[in-house]
From Swiss-Prot:
Motif stretch ('KMSKS' region): 520-524
InterPro entries in the cross-refs: aa-tRNA-synth_I_CS (IPR001412), aa-tRNA-synth_Ia (IPR002300), Anticodon_Ia_Val (IPR033705), M/V/L/I-tRNA-synth_anticd-bd (IPR013155), Rossmann-like_a/b/a_fold (IPR014729), tRNA-bd_arm (IPR010978), tRNAsynth_Ia_anticodon-bd (IPR009080), Val-tRNA_synth_C_sf (IPR037118)
UniProt name for this protein: Valine--tRNA ligase
Binding site for ATP: 523
Molecular-function annotations in GO: aminoacyl-tRNA deacylase activity; ATP binding; valine-tRNA ligase activity
Length: 876
């Protein structure tokens, strides 16, 4: 297959993915004797197109599964998408609002039709993006969290947990979005620091003897106060415990109670209790059997319990209430106060802690089982390991999980209420006398269905499902560390509860993709990057390699166009190296022609040794998910060892008349390049397929090729030392040429004083490499080389490299040139010194700019010292 002179990612990638999918290369093996390897894709939300975080996440999964497929595993990489309840519903509602329509205008059934249309549209976008990224997914098994099979699993889990008493219906404080009018999970609440106020009010004692000071950031909630609490150990209030105060404006009498929850040192040490509008107050209220008074409705407006403030927006009520309290001389002070306020991730509304009747999952026993499992052989391994502590900490401090949502898009709760008796029926099927029952209108939290993802996608609850029996538990979960609590932990406890097994063996956690300056990517900052735009510019392979190798497990990744471009340059280097190799291998060279048992040269032995070392390193690091280190190992071997050194060295035999040596070189080129393509393939699937198809090969595709194996017979340890000596000599000569301003094209005499006779023999046997790379007019290698008076001498491992200067350069002219260069460097040093000693510059300039000037100074100083040393050497 022809390789064009220039690497063009568009040409290389065009049609390739469709060919892979059409030929079924990503389907699991039909050989059931193979060990399985499974990853189920973390399902992206059907709310929109994929971002860089998704690209990073799925690239890592694809690298792992491609590698395992090549290593002979029966590999399944299963695709799917999440209905993303509130997020998708918000998008669909926004679209309807543009037409002046609400979901209530349409009704539930028609609205859900609109939501399904949205899902189909965005699912096709997501599939197209998966294709552009080159993900090796088995589309015949694609799942969706609302499809029939998963709905069956969701109903079974809900009913089973209800029957076990783990799911219950009750009153709790939940996160309430008054704009979307639904409960929110903790992950759907974004906390932001907001400039607010701390209001200090007087609550007069009922006996008229003074007042108690109360501070709050939410004055509107005081209308629902039912008690004041103080710490029983607080000497200031020991005498008032049991007394009562009058709730300002309302006139209700509130008891003063003792509770150790109160922080003696915070504020006045006395705290108002509003059980219906604060989670901590609710717990206090439960302990003291306080009344729950809800003073707002679901829209965030004050209700009839708020008296004269009924109908007002909560924030308007706050202003009016403070004004009224001032008029009654009940305001002590108002302090500016920055505090963390929860906002709905979807609507942006300030979240209201709100007492509501919801469905909950009782978490204590489920969490305990998850923690206990981490002490067994069936434990889940976290990469990095430190995140296991994060997981354990959360499980130890877990609260019951609110699972009901006041939405239409999602799994409707399988609970029905009898129209006359109010009896609750929970079942996988509706009651037979359905006309007497009303189904709960709420849907389940999106995380409830996605918590079942590893096993519901494989056919559970059908325990006889072939996929479930063969591919569960899965092998690895790759996801962001930001959803350990909300997804990873829930999959673990649901997997253990319903399958008695961990849902995955390993959890590989990565960070967030950030902008180059370290800030979070966001629409408001305008610093987001569309991965598809990057692919259009540089190709999928460039983006994939950057994402995979640009960070280490558990750390954030800073996106950099410059670094993506450097990967593109790396691929160009590979492309050019492959083209040279293929031109020398020749079209008639076949796999069976590869013979590595012949008379291998030093360069052949060295590159084969380095190849085997790289295979071992890449395999070992990949097993530990250290893809950043893998990237460095591959880059160093391919760019430096293979392209810069071996390819150049291979020109010696290829330009000779020795046909036997040419054939050996062709074998080494072909074998090495083939193994490079195989190692690179999981990272760069498109370009490696293109090059591999042009190489002598067996099989239809590199996707199904075997992973490279270390061959002990092709490791020649002694070749590394000899090559190291030669490379050091070559680099030394080249550096000396630069220093005396003599181009490589000009032949010069070179003397090498070998450290001992053994080195002298080794260098003499391999002098062809020195002749090719150093271009000497004469080359003298000996232990007793006489060093001329005027010469440049470099000390190397093998001895000394000497360049006689007599006749090579005009000494006076060269000294004059170097002195002018020294003067220029001195002037640059003076300029930078002046800048860095300027207090005005140092105090006002950004740190980045200051560091850049310091770097320049260091560079100039190093150059200055080098030029000065050369002048002294020439004058000596």
């Amino acid at each position: 297959m022809e390789m064009k002179p220039k690497y063009d990612p568009r040409e290389v990638e065009a049609g390739r993915y469709e060919e892979w999918v059409k030929n079924g290369y990503f389907k699991p093996s039909e050989d059931k004797s193979k060990e399985t390897y499974t990853i189920v894709i973390p399902p992206p939300n059907v709310t929109g197109k994929l971002h860089l975080g998704h690209a990073w996440d799925t690239t890592l999964q694809d690298i792992i599964t491609r590698m395992k497929r090549m290593q002979g595993y029966d590999t399944l990489y299963l695709p799917g998408m999440d209905h993303a309840g509130i997020a998708t519903q918000a998008k669909v509602e926004a679209k309807l609002n543009e037409q002046g329509i609400t979901r209530y205008d349409l009704g539930r059934e028609k609205f859900l039709e609109q939501a399904w249309d949205w899902k189909e549209e965005y699912a096709s976008f997501i599939r197209a993006q998966w294709a552009k990224l080159g993900l090796g997914l088995d589309y015949s098994r694609e799942r969706f969290t609302l499809d029939e099979g998963l709905s069956k699993a969701v109903k079974k889990v809900f009913v089973d947990l209800y029957n076990k008493g783990i799911i219950y219906r009750g009153e709790r404080i939940i996160n309430w979005d008054p704009k979307a009018r639904t409960a929110l999970s903790d992950i759907e609440v974004i906390h932001e620091d907001v400039q607010g106020a701390f209001y200090h009010f007087k609550y007069p004692y009922a006996d008229g003897e003074g007042f108690i000071e109360i501070a709050t950031t939410r004055p509107e909630t005081m209308l629902g106060d039912t008690a004041i609490v103080v710490n029983p150990n607080d000497e200031r209030y020991k005498d008032v415990i049991g007394k009562t105060v009058i709730l300002p404006i309302v006139g209700r009498e509130l008891p003063i109670l003792a509770d150790e929850y109160v922080d003696i040192d915070f504020g006045s040490g006395a705290m108002k209790v509003t059980p219906a509008h604060d989670p901590n107050d609710f717990e206090i209220g439960q302990r003291h059997q306080l009344e729950n008074i809800i003073v707002m409705d679901e829209n965030g407006k004050m209700n009839d319990k708020a008296g004269k403030y009924e109908g007002m927006d909560r924030f308007d009520c706050r202003k009016q209430l403070v004004k009224d309290l001032k008029e009654q001389d009940l305001v002590i002070k108002i302090e500016d106060h920055v505090h963390s306020v929860g906002h709905s991730e979807r609507s942006g509304a300030v979240v209201e802690p709100y007492l509501s009747t919801q469905w909950f999952v009782r978490m204590e026993d489920l969490a305990k089982r998850s923690l206990d499992n981490q002490k067994t052989d069936d434990r889940i391994d976290f990469y990095p390991q430190r995140f296991e502590h994060t997981f354990n900490q959360w499980m130890e401090n877990i609260r019951d999980w609110t699972i009901s949502r006041q939405l239409w898009w999602g799994h409707q709760i399988p609970a029905w209420y009898h129209k006359e008796t109010g009896e609750i029926y929970v079942g996988e099927e509706a009651p037979t006398d359905i006309e007497n029952w009303q189904q709960d209108e709420d849907v389940l939290d999106t995380w409830f269905s996605s918590a079942l993802w590893p096993f519901s996608t494989l056919g559970w609850p059908d325990l006889e499902s072939e996929d479930f029996k063969r591919y569960y538990p899965t092998n690895a979960l790759v996801t962001g560390y930001d959803i350990i609590f909300f997804w990873v932990a829930r999959m673990i406890f649901q997997g253990l509860e319903f399958t008695d097994r961990r849902p995955f063996n390993d959890v590989l956690l990565h960070g967030l993709v950030r902008a180059e300056d370290g800030r979070k990517m966001s629409k408001s900052l305008g610093n987001g990057v569309d991965p598809m735009d990057v692919i259009d510019e540089y190709g999928a392979d460039s983006l994939r390699y950057f994402l995979a190798t640009g960070s280490s497990p558990g750390h954030d990744l800073r996106y950099s166009t410059e670094k993506v471009e450097s990967v593109w340059n790396f691929i160009n280097k590979i492309w050019n190296g492959a083209r040279f190799s293929l031109m020398n291998i020749g079209e008639d060279f076949k796999v069976e022609d590869i013979d590595l048992s012949g008379n291998l040269s030093l360069a052949d032995k060295w590159i084969l040794t380095r190849l085997n070392e790289t295979i071992a390193t890449v395999t070992d690091l990949s097993d530990k998910y250290e893809f950043g280190e893998v990237g460095r190992a591959l880059y160093n071997f391919i760019w430096d060892d293979f392209c810069d050194w071996y390819i150049e060295m291979s020109k010696i035999p290829m330009n000779s008349n020795d046909e036997e040596q040419k054939q050996v070189t062709r074998s080494v080129l072909s074998y090495t390049l083939d193994n490079i393509m195989r190692m690179l393939h999981p990272f760069m699937p498109f370009v490696t397929e293109k090059i591999w198809q042009s190489l002598p090969h067996e099989g239809d595709t590199i996707v199904k090729a075997s992973w490279p194996e270390v061959r002990e017979s092709l490791i020649f340890e002694e070749s590394k030392q000899t090559m190291q000596q030669l490379v050091e000599i070559i680099k030394s000569v080249r550096q000396s040429r630069v220093e005396v301003n003599t181009p490589l094209s000009k032949e010069i005499p070179i003397l090498i004083q070998a450290k001992d006779k053994e080195i002298e023999t080794t260098l003499s046997q391999n002098k062809d490499y020195l002749i090719k790379f150093c271009n000497p007019s004469t080359l003298n290698i000996s232990t007793d080389v006489e060093i001329p008076e005027k010469a440049m001498t470099s000390v190397v491992i093998a001895g000394k490299v000497v360049l006689p200067l007599e006749g090579l350069i005009d000494m006076d002219k060269e000294i004059s040139r170097l002195e002018k260069e020294l003067a220029k460097l001195q002037s640059e040093l003076d300029r930078v010194d002046k800048k860095l000693s300027n207090e005005n510059f140092v105090s006002k300039a950004p740190e980045k700019v200051i560091n850049e000037e310091k770097r320049k100074k260091q560079d100039y100083q190093e150059k200055y010292d080098g030029v000065k040393a050369r002048i002294e050497q020439l004058k000596a």
